């Protein structure tokens, strides 16, 4: 597990829910290592390089709290001479353009779209409610009257075309 900034809410939640998803699916897991890479590709590459030296072929899956760290893990594997078909199953979060390209190339198995446009729409709706003198907690669908949750969408090779910019 490549985690973002220590104590950062997104890093904590992405780590927690990745683990919960595996447990819910009853996937047998042996955790070999986890470390913070502070959302940075270079730091993630260094961590992965260390793990490859320590664990070698025992690494089957790498969860990264963002796409840059997932790409850093891929960089380390390829720099170590690993063939694409031998890469661990690596996933990230954010559906950034470089990550989508890596999904298309087959080096990144998937990412999760962090819906910036949807977040902006929710922020605008909250602002409009407040400016209109309304309580957003009662006029909008907010959890506990405070939180706007958006669904995350998994992006894999199967649905990649939906997320690529139109040419």
Where are these regions (language model features)?
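Hydrophobic alpha-helical
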Residues: 18, 37-101
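Short beta-strand elements in bilobed, periplasmic/extracellular small-molecule ligand-binding domains
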Residues: 1, 19-41
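Loop/turn elements at helix/coil->beta-strand transitions in domains of secreted/extracellular proteins
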Residues: 24-30, 56-60, 85-88, 106-109
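Short beta-strand elements at the ligand-binding edges of bilobed clamshell
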Residues: 1-5, 34, 105-117
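A general structural signal for well-ordered alpha-helical segments in protein cores
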Residues: 14-15, 70, 100, 120-124
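Hinge/cleft segment of the Venus flytrap/periplasmic-binding protein
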Residues: 2-10, 20-24, 118-167
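Conserved donor sugar-nucleotide recognition element shared by glycan-biosynthetic enzymes
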Residues: 10-14, 40, 44, 120
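Beta-strand segments within the central parallel beta-sheet cores of soluble alpha/beta enzyme folds
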Residues: 1-3, 32, 87-91, 148
